[in-house]
C-alpha cells in the first residue's frame, strides 16, 4: 500500500471515530462492561482516552495480573466513588498482606460493592474488618479461603447485602459481632461447608428481609438460630431438626425449606419439624422438600391462614400425609404444585396408603384454582388416589396440569384418559398432560 493510501485510511479512521464523540458518562458505562485489562488498554487510543479509564466505576482483577499493576490501577482511580471492585486472588500467588493492602485501598476509594474470593493452598486470609468503618459499602461478597475474625462489633451502617460463600469463622462471637454492626442489612446469603468452627450460628438481624442459608455441615453440635422480625423471604437448605430454630419471623411471606438430613431420633425430629412448620404460619408461599420418613406433627391449632401457594416434593412416603395436613390447615390455598421423582420408583415404601382428610378441606371447596403435578407417574397407587381425590373435590379448579418427560407418549395418553374418567367437581377445569417440564 502506498503512503498516500495509508494517509487516506488514517484520515478516514479519524473521521469515522464517532465513539469518542459520545458523552463521557456513556463512555464510562460502556467501559464498565469490559475486562479491566482491556479498559486500561484504551488509554493509547487518543488524548481523550488517556485518562478516561481512571474514571471507570467498576473494576475487576484476578490472579493472572501482577499485584503491582493492580495496586497502580487502584491508586490511579479518580472517580469520586468506586462503584464495584471484584478481586479473585490466589494465595499461592498473592500474600495475605498484599490482598489486605488491596482491600484497604478499596475502602479508601469509598467502594460500594466489594467481591473478594481467595483460592489456593496457603493459610486462610483474615478479612481486615478493622478497616470496615466504611460508610459507603453497600454490598460485600466474600468467598472460599477467608476467615471471619471479628473480636468486636463492626460499623457497616450502609451495608444492605452480605454474601458469605463457604468462608470460615473464628468463633460464635465473630458471627454476632459482624451481623450486629450491619444495622441496615436487608439481604443475607450464607453458605456453610463442613466446618465445626461455630457451635451456635445466630442470625439476629432486625432489618433483614431476605435470608438464604445453605448448611452443608453435618456437625451434630452446630445450631442455627434465626431471629429476624422483618424477614419476608427465607430459603433454608440443611438439616431440619433441633439444630434449626426459627424464633421470630412474624413478617415472613415466602419460605422454601429443603431437608437434607438423616434423623437418628424420629420422635424428636417429628416434633421439631412440626415446630418449624408452626413458626411459618404467616407465609403466603411455601415450598417443602423433606428427606426422611417422618410422621409429621405440628402444634395443635396451627393454621396457615395466609397461604395461597404450596409446593411439595413427593420423594418420601410421609409427604402424602403432610399434604393432607397442609390442605386441612390452609383454608385459602389457591395454587398446589407437586414435584415427583424424575424416574419411576420401585421401592414398596412409595406405595404406602394415603390417609385422605376426614372432611373435604375448605381450600378445595372454595379457593384452589391451579394444580401442577410435575413428574407424575400414574403407576404408584398413592399418586392415583391423591390425583383423583383432588379432581373429585376441588369445586373451583380452573386448570390441572400433569407432566412427565420420561414416559412414552402412549403412556401419557393412557394416564390422561384415566384422569379424564374422574367425575370432577369443577365443570370448567382444563385438564392437561404435558411432556415438557412445567412451572406454576
Regions found by a protein language model. Give the residues of each.
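LRR N-terminal entry segment and analogous cap-like coil->beta motifs
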Residues: 57-62, 77-92, 109-119, 137-138, ...
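Conserved hydrophobic position(s) of the canonical leucine-rich repeat
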Residues: 56, 82, 111-114, 137, ...
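C-terminal helix/juxtamembrane-tail motif
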Residues: 1-4, 405-440
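A structural signal for leucine-rich repeat
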Residues: 100-105, 128-134, 151-159, 175-183, ...
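Leucine-rich repeat
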Residues: 2-5, 10-204, 363, ...
Amino acid at each position: 500500500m502506498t503512503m498516500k493510501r495509508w494517509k487516506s485510511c488514517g484520515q478516514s479512521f479519524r473521521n469515522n471515530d464517532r465513539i469518542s464523540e459520545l458523552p463521557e458518562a456513556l463512555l464510562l458505562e460502556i467501559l464498565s462492561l469490559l475486562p479491566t485489562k482491556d479498559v486500561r488498554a484504551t488509554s493509547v487510543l487518543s488524548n481523550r482516552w488517556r485518562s478516561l479509564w481512571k474514571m471507570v466505576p467498576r473494576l475487576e482483577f484476578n490472579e493472572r495480573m501482577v499485584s503491582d499493576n493492580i495496586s497502580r490501577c487502584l491508586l490511579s482511580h479518580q472517580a469520586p466513588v468506586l462503584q464495584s471492585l471484584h478481586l479473585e486472588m490466589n494465595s499461592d500467588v498473592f500474600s495475605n498482606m498484599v490482598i489486605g493492602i488491596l482491600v484497604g485501598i478499596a475502602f479508601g476509594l469509598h467502594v460500594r460493592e466489594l467481591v473478594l474470593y481467595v483460592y489456593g493452598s496457603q493459610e486462610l486470609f483474615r478479612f481486615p474488618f478493622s478497616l470496615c468503618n466504611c460508610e459507603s459499602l453497600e454490598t460485600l461478597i466474600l468467598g472460599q479461603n477467608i476467615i471471619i475474625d471479628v473480636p468486636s462489633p463492626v460499623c457497616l451502617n450502609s451495608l444492605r447485602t452480605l454474601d458469605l460463600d463457604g468462608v470460615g469463622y473464628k468463633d460464635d462471637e465473630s458471627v454476632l459481632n459482624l451481623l450486629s454492626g450491619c444495622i441496615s442489612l436487608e439481604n443475607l446469603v450464607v453458605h456453610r461447608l463442613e466446618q465445626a468452627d461455630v457451635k451456635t450460628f445466630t442470625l439476629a438481624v432486625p432489618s433483614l428481609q431476605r435470608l438464604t442459608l445453605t448448611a452443608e455441615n453435618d456437625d451434630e453440635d452446630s445450631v442455627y438460630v434465626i431471629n429476624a422480625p422483618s424477614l419476608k423471604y427465607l430459603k433454608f437448605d440443611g438439616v431440619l431438626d433441633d439444630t434449626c430454630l426459627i424464633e421470630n419471623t412474624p413478617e415472613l411471606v415466602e419460605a422454601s425449606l429443603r431437608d437434607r438430613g438423616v434423623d437418628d431420633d424420629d420422635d424428636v425430629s417429628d416434633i421439631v419439624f412440626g415446630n418449624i412448620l408452626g413458626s411459618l404460619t404467616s407465609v403466603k408461599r411455601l415450598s417443602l422438600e423433606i428427606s426422611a420418613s417422618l410422621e409429621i406433627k405440628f402444634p395443635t391449632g396451627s393454621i396457615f391462614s395466609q397461604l395461597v401457594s404450596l409446593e411439595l416434593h413427593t420423594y418420601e412416603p410421609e409427604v402424602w400425609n403432610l399434604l393432607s395436613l397442609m390442605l386441612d390447615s390452609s383454608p385459602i390455598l389457591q395454587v398446589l404444585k407437586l414435584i415427583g421423582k424424575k424416574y419411576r420408583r420401585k421401592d414398596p415404601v412409595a406405595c404406602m396408603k394415603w390417609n385422605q382428610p376426614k372432611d373435604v378441606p375448605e381450600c378445595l371447596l372454595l379457593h384452589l384454582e391451579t394444580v401442577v403435578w410435575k413428574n407424575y407417574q400414574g403407576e404408584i397407587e398413592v399418586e392415583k388416589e391423591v390425583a383423583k381425590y383432588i379432581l373429585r373435590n376441588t369445586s373451583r379448579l380452573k386448570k390441572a396440569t400433569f407432566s412427565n418427560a420420561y414416559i412414552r407418549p402412549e403412556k401419557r395418553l393412557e394416564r390422561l384418559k384415566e384422569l379424564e374418567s374422574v367425575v370432577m367437581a369443577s365443570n370448567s377445569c382444563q385438564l392437561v398432560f404435558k411432556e415438557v417440564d412445567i412451572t406454576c
